[in-house]
From Swiss-Prot:
This is Interleukin-15. It comes from Bos taurus (Bovine). One of its GO terms (biological process) is natural killer cell proliferation. GO terms for molecular function: cytokine activity; cytokine receptor binding. Keywords: Cytokine, Disulfide bond, Glycoprotein, Secreted, Signal. Glycans are attached at residues 104, 113, 121, 127. Residues 1-29 form the signal peptide. Gene3D superfamilies: Interleukin-15/Interleukin-21. Disulfide bonds join 83-133, 90-136. GO terms for cellular component: cytosol; extracellular space; nuclear speck.
Length: 162
């Protein structure tokens, strides 16, 4: 099972600060490390994790077919691009229903990993309020198969805008 740690990017800044505090800043190499560290801290974070989210969703779909689960979930089928963060948060909440209904250890691990990946990607997006978006409970209830198909569509919206 792969577990990605998207929070490791911030540790490089801590390393640079440690170098600075240990008086390495006075050497030419220390100055180069400090300047490169400042530049790398300002670079945008790559969002390659969305493809892993899609892969995890496909794995969940295959596992659910094997255990014959037939729950209905609140599903955003035609999300407006301005509401994609709200839609993603609803999808992540509904994943908890799959987790509860399946009681499968493999599905549990995949959903935990998927949630971590999606939340790390969402954390890099500005926290802006999306007006006019539907609440999760206002969405239509659909089958798990339809839910996962719509979930992949929302993830692709994030991939296309990054």
């Amino acid at each position: 099972m792969r577990i990605l740690k998207p929070y490791l990017r911030s540790t490089s800044i801590q390393c640079y600060l440690c170098l600075l505090l240990n008086s390495h800043f006075l050497t030419e190499a220390g100055i180069h490390v400090f300047i490169l560290g400042c530049i790398s801290a300002s670079l945008p974070k790559t969002e390659a994790n969305w493809q892993y989210v899609i892969n995890d969703l496909k794995t969940i779909e295959h596992l659910i077919q094997s255990i014959h689960m037939d729950a209905t979930l609140y599903t955003e089928s035609d999300a407006h691009p301005n509401c994609k963060v709200t839609a993603m948060q609803c999808f992540l909440l509904e994943l908890r229903v799959i987790l509860h209904e399946s009681k499968n250890a493999t599905i549990y691990e995949i959903i935990e990993n998927l949630t971590m990946l999606a939340n790390s990607n969402l954390s890099s997006i500005e926290n802006k309020t999306e007006l006019g978006c539907k609440e999760c409970e206002e969405l239509e209830e659909k089958s798990i198969k339809e839910f996962l198909k719509s979930f992949v569509h929302i993830v692709q919206m994030f991939i296309n805008t990054s």
